[in-house]
Amino acid sequence: MYYPFVRKALFQLDPERAHEFTFQQMRRITGTPLEALLRQKVPSKPVSCMGLTFKNPLGLAAGLDKNGECIDALGALGFGSVEIGTVTPRPQPGNDKPRLFRLVEAEGLINRMGFNNLGVDNLVENVKKAHFDGVLGINIGKNKDTPVEQGKDDYLICMEKVFPYAGYIAINISSPNTPGLRSLQYGDALDDLLAAIKNQQQVLSQKHHKYVPVAVKIAPDLSLEELIQVADSLVRHNIDGVIATNTTLDRSLVQGMKYCDETGGLSGRPLQLKSTEIIRLLSQELQGRLPIIGVGGIDSVIAAREKIAAGASLIQIYSGFIFKGPPLVKEIVTHL
């Protein structure tokens, strides 16, 4: 397959520059006959989850296409779902560069992007132009300069704007790169946020005459006690799904490697075991009351099967896709 050669060239570039270059090329060929070069035939393996039918269980995780610029090109690769974002009410530049690092030996990434995006209105315009026939997830967050106490307002603003266009909405309260954001995962702050989100979902469902499920994305760095509390809150508020997990602050598996001490969230192979364990514990606690979307270090068929065996109904990839490329999509969907 051609990807090892493409990867070699891309890995000569700074990681963020490589990402920008790739998206530039994808945008250039979308809607032209060259788009056929991206298209991969994958088997149909329908899965029902959150009241939606997914063409197959494999999705692209949020963070790769923050502004919804390459939905059709990514969809052509065979994903059953594509999750775009994280998007915030207002555009923001994110953290200072450099803010994305490859840990090549570990097949991991560290990022401290900080929700860099062009704002929810820009994303909605891009979504309107897309023709992807899979499930489109839209991941929403709060602006960095919005006080955490008013954070729920940012989620409600984004919900209202994306609701007519989303297959499902993902609530990101677990990025380590927005100060104070992870505090929304705990106790009264979480209950307050979930109550507001559920109320907004009901209001918007009546307004638009359609139901859009809401999933909450959680961190892998929760203690067992915290995880049990989160699970209890999700069930009490009738949230439709949980995405487990976001990136980790734990560096125990990458000690001594280049960039291991960079601030930010670690993803990829070093996150694999930790995220699978969170899924297993969450599954035990939830007892099937809401579905789990498993993400974190999936880079092979076996890693994908482990997530499903632990209790995930759907799975997503990101870092594995960077390191293994489009062939990973076909390989996982074919052999799941």
UniProtKB/Swiss-Prot annotation:
InterPro entries named among the record's database cross-references: Aldolase_TIM, DHO_dehydrogenase, Dihydroorotate_DH_1_2, Dihydroorotate_DH_2, Dihydroorotate_DH_cat, Dihydroorotate_DH_CS
One GO BP: 'de novo' pyrimidine nucleobase biosynthetic process
Residues that coordinate or bind FMN: A62, G63, L64, D65, K66, T86, N139, N172, K217, T245, G268, G297, Y318, S319
Residue numbers annotated as active site: S175 (nucleophile)
Catalytic activity from the UniProt record: (S)-dihydroorotate + a quinone = orotate + a quinol
Cofactor note: Binds 1 FMN per subunit.
Cofactor(s) it depends on: FMN
Claim: Oxidoreductase is one of the keywords in the record: yes
Pfam family, one: DHO_dh
Membrane topology: Peripheral membrane protein
GO cellular component terms given for this protein: cytoplasm; plasma membrane
Protein residues bound to substrate: K66, N111, R112, M113, G114, F115, N172, N177, N246, T247
Pathway per the UniProt entry: Pyrimidine metabolism; UMP biosynthesis via de novo pathway; orotate from (S)-dihydroorotate (quinone route): step 1/1
Family matches, as PANTHER family: DIHYDROOROTATE DEHYDROGENASE (QUINONE), MITOCHONDRIAL, DIHYDROOROTATE DEHYDROGENASE (QUINONE), MITOCHONDRIAL-RELATED
HAMAP family assigned: DHO_dh_type2
Family named by the database record: Belongs to the dihydroorotate dehydrogenase family. Type 2 subfamily.
Function: Catalyzes the conversion of dihydroorotate to orotate with quinone as electron acceptor.
Protein name per UniProt: Dihydroorotate dehydrogenase (quinone)
Gene name per UniProt: pyrD
